[in-house]
C-alpha cells in the first residue's frame, strides 16, 4: 500500500507582499513601524489563502517556521539603529551612575542617664589621676635641691628688701634737699625784706669787717647791725652745706652713687656717724675804742 506515494506534493506559491502606494518618508528616529506593518500584512494575506484552499479541498502549503529567529506572535520590534555617525557603544551613550558618598545626618543624640554616668566617671578618674601624680611629684625633690630653692628664695627676699631701703633713702634725701632749698629761699626773702628803704638816699652795703661809726645811745643802729649779722650767718651756713655736699659727691661717699649692693655695707654706712660742719660766726664789735673814746 505505498504510504509514501499516496501524499500529494503541495505546490508552494511565492507571495509578494503588497507595496503601499504612498512613498514612506525616512524618519530620523529608530525604524520599527514600517517593519511591523509589513509583517502584519503578510500574516493576514497568508491566512486568507489558506482559508480559500481548505474550501477547495486542498491542503495549505508548508510554512517556514521562524522558531528561534522571529517570534510566532507578531509584536512591535524596536531596532535602535542610529542613522547618524555617532558612538555605537551603549556604555558611552548611557553611562552608569557615579558612586556618591553618603554622609550621615547629624541628629541630636538623646542624652541618657547611662551616658551621663559614664561622663562623670571619666571626669572623676582623670581628676584622681592628676592628684596622684602631684602627690608622687612632691617627695621627688632631694635635700640638696630643697636647700638650693630655699637659698634662692632668701636671696630674692634680701634683694627686694635692699631695693625698698634704697628707694626710701632716695626719697628722704630728695625731701631734705627740698627743705634746704625752701630754707634758702626763705632766708633770701628775709634778707630782701630786712634791707632799709631809702627815701632818695644812697644805700650803703655793710660788710662784717668794717667798723661802723655810731653813737652809743642810738638803738636804731644796734637793731640794724644785729639784723645784718644774722643774715650773713645764714648765708654763710647754707654756702658751706652746699660745698660739703659737692665734696661728698666728688669723693663718691654718698650712698646713691655707690654701686655696692651688699646689705652689710649698707648697715655699716648707717652706723657710721655723719661728718659735722663747722661754721664760724663773726661778730661785729659794737664798741670801738678809737671812735667811742673821743
Swiss-Prot record:
- Signal peptide location in the record? none
**Tissue expression per record:** Expressed in proximal tubules of the kidney.
Which residue spans traverse the membrane? none
Q: Region Disordered: start and end of each range?
A: 1-28, 255-279
Keyword Membrane present in the record's keywords: the answer is yes
Primary residence: membrane
Could you name the Gene Ontology cellular component terms for this entry?
Answer: cytoplasmic vesicle; plasma membrane
Which UniProt keywords are given for this protein, alphabetically ordered?
Cell membrane, Cytoplasmic vesicle, Lipoprotein, Membrane, Myristate
Per UniProt, subcellular location reads as: Cell membrane; Cytoplasmic vesicle
Q: Where is the composition biased (Polar residues)?
A: 17-28
Q: Point to the regions of Basic residues compositional bias.
A: 1-12
What role does it play?
May be involved in tuning the metabolism, energy expenditure, and excretion processes.
Question: Which PANTHER family does the protein's record reference?
Answer: COILED-COIL DOMAIN CONTAINING 198
The protein's name in its UniProt record: Factor associated with metabolism and energy
Organism from which the protein derives: Mus musculus
